[in-house]
Regions:
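Cytosolic juxtamembrane helix and N-cap/initiation of the first transmembrane helix
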Residues: 1-21
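Membrane-interface helix-boundary motifs at transmembrane edges
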Residues: 3-9, 65-74, 124
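Membrane-interfacial loop-to-transmembrane alpha-helix junctions, especially the N-terminal start
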Residues: 9-16, 72-80
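Core segments of alpha-helical transmembrane spans in multipass integral membrane proteins
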Residues: 17-32, 43-66, 79-82
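"…centered on the first transmembrane helix and the immediately adjacent amphipathic helix/loop
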Residues: 33-37
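Non-cytosolic membrane-interface motifs at loop->transmembrane helix junctions
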Residues: 38-45, 96-110
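Hydrophobic cores of alpha-helical transmembrane segments in multi-pass inner/ER membrane proteins
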Residues: 53-61, 109-121
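Membrane-helix boundary connector in multi-pass membrane proteins
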Residues: 70-71, 81-82, 88-106, 121-124
């Protein structure tokens, strides 16, 4: 598979945007009370916040490695882009099924846009 330099450069710039989109969605979901809405996913608010903080710190820690084009980091970034595409799509689909607001619905398009653009640009 051919890896084009301009794809890497674009991906390097898109990854921080995806991390920021994850932060914004985590904030929306927390404020909207997602963690208490579904029994199977019910988490104590403290755990919900700590989990997302740890996740965001991990994702942010990858930014320099992605920026330097380290292959392992680019692969993780692409995997994370796919996870966020699925996450964003699921929030939007559930909102459509419920025909109303679903926590994370407003920020889900950010995950879809940044995730799809990043996954497309990182053809590794």
């Amino acid at each position: 598979m051919t890896l084009h330099h301009h794809h890497l450069t674009t991906g390097r710039h898109l990854y921080p945007g995806l991390v920021l989109a994850r932060f914004v969605q985590a904030f929306e979901v927390y404020v909207a009370g997602f963690q208490g809405r579904y029994p199977l996913l019910a988490l104590a608010p403290e755990f919900f916040v700590l989990f997302h903080l740890a996740l965001l710190l991990l994702l942010a820690a990858l930014i320099p490695s992605v920026a330097h084009g380290r292959r392992w980091a680019l692969r993780l970034a692409k995997l994370w882009a796919i996870v966020e595409i699925l996450n964003g799509a699921s929030h939007m689909m559930i909102a459509l099924i419920e025909w109303g607001y679903y926590p994370g619905m407003w920020t889900a398009p950010l995950l879809l846009i940044f995730g799809a653009a990043l996954a497309r640009s990182l053809r590794v």
